A protein has these predicted regions:
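Extreme N-terminal signal-anchor transmembrane helix of membrane signaling/transducer proteins, especially
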Residues: 2-41
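Cytoplasm-proximal transmembrane signaling helix
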Residues: 9, 13, 204, 264-320
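Extracytoplasmic/periplasmic sensory segments of membrane signal-transduction proteins
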Residues: 41-49, 53-149
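Solvent-exposed, extracytoplasmic
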Residues: 84-100, 177, 181-219
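Extracytoplasmic/periplasmic ligand-binding sensor regions of membrane-associated signaling proteins
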Residues: 99-100, 111, 117-185, 191-194, ...
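Membrane-proximal, non-catalytic sensory/regulatory domains of signal-transducing membrane proteins
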Residues: 110, 140-173, 199-203, 207-208, ...
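Short, hydrophobic beta-strand elements of compact beta-sandwich sensory domains
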Residues: 168, 180-187, 252-279
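HAMP-domain connector/hinge
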Residues: 324-333
Length: 333
């Protein structure tokens, strides 16, 4: 009878173990998929935060430039027809606006090549006309004349200021006549500070594929090779996750175009693998516990339901002993 108990218990336990293992595998698969999708969505959301930061930065400075243009255009035409009148009437407006947004430079380039310049580096003086800057050869001047909208330069190194700036320029017309080209120089450091405060390991490439803004300032080091990220992005496109190797470490990333820039977010593959492995570890422990409990319970359940068979076996043995004259007593079943 003990042999039957063991065999039945073993069969029942093997079936239960198989079912629990299958259940565990299926559960792990769906858990892994859920964690993977959740993590990727979280990283995508963080990338969108950086994208929105860049867009808001651009929108704010464009609104500033339009407001400045409007105030200049609203001046009487007599205030804009001579250099002296422009200095006296436009100069204070340029200085006021520069202070309001803490710009590096705010200026008005005239048709004769001169520029009325308000500088942060020379704040004590009122804006003055200069003719030594060769403004007509500058992109901000030429491109603004080609469009009716605001032209925005990519971040570039200003040779005079010795720092990276972003220029917003707009051609100004009054009564159908060109007054000049308005320019506003914003330090790219302002954008860097905004990006630095965004969550996640995000950064911005300029048109030359150099990082100029990042949450991790170590990435601004020009000696770092970022080609693995750029190459993976080229193969996968905007907002598509990719994997790449960096210093023998597997990493995940996603990038998207934001105007002239490329915004990216990257993380170690561990950010996905760790919670998956943790979930797998917990499920394995739970599976072992469930199998152990199942084995014990099934053994006792089988033993309980087979106990009447033991009485029947005893009764039958006694009966056959009686009819074979081996005993004079018969046990009741």
């Amino acid at each position: 009878m003990n042999s039957i108990k063991i065999k039945l218990s073993l069969i029942a336990n093997l079936i239960a173990i198989f079912a629990l293992i299958v259940l565990g595998i299926v559960s792990f698969y769906f858990t892994k998929t859920s964690l993977y999708e959740s993590t990727l969505k979280n990283q995508t959301d963080l990338l969108k935060v950086t994208q929105s930061t860049v867009e808001d930065f651009r929108s704010t400075n464009q609104s500033f430039t339009r407001a400045l243009e409007k105030d200049i255009v609203n001046l009487p035409y007599q205030s804009l027809i001579t250099e002296e009148n422009i200095i006296n009437n436009v100069g204070p407006i340029l200085k006021y606006y520069r202070h309001s947004i803490n710009a590096l430079n705010v200026y008005l380039g005239l048709n004769n090549g001169k520029v009325l310049l308000s500088q942060k580096s020379n704040d004590a003086k009122m804006p003055e006309l200069r003719d030594d800057l060769d403004i007509k050869t500058k992109d901000w001047y030429q491109e603004a004349l080609k469009t009716n909208d605001i032209f925005v330069t990519p971040a570039y190194l200003d040779t005079i200021l010795k720092q990276y700036v972003i220029t917003y320029s707009k051609a100004i017309y009054k009564d159908g006549k060109i007054i000049g080209v308005l320019g506003v120089d914003i330090p790219s450091e302002d954008l860097q500070n905004l990006v630095a405060n965004t969550p996640g390991n995000t950064f911005l490439f300029d048109q030359k594929n150099k990082i100029f803004a990042a949450t991790n300032k170590e990435l601004l080091n020009p000696s770092i090779d970022h080609s693995p990220v750029l190459n993976a992005y080229k193969l996968n496109g905007d907002n598509n996750f990719f994997s790449y190797k960096l210093n023998n470490e597997e990493r995940l990333g996603a990038c998207t175009k934001v105007f002239a820039y490329t915004a990216c977010i990257t993380e170690s593959a561990d950010i996905i693998n760790k919670p998956i492995f943790k979930a797998a570890y917990i499920q394995v422990i739970a599976l072992i516990v469930m199998i152990s409990i199942s084995v014990i319970l099934l053994y006792f359940i089988v033993s309980k339901y087979l106990s009447p068979l033991a009485a029947i076996q005893t009764g039958l043995t006694s009966f056959f002993d009686f009819i074979n004259y081996k005993t004079k007593n018969v046990s009741t079943i």
